[in-house]
């Protein structure tokens, strides 16, 4: 399994949506993915609504978030 770093998937740029974390190459906030999942919507619906985000990027971003959280709890 290839390791993905945050900058490969999620970026922050003050010129893009005021610097909130977005998927690289898009204006789609990472928070939008979390909101969809929190609301009980499937990943497939998020990807359908935001076609500029690939399945691979969404899964990689979730893996990064999981790793970060688990790392903080250790």
Which residues does each PLM region occupy?
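A short, structured beta-strand/loop element
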Residues: 4-44
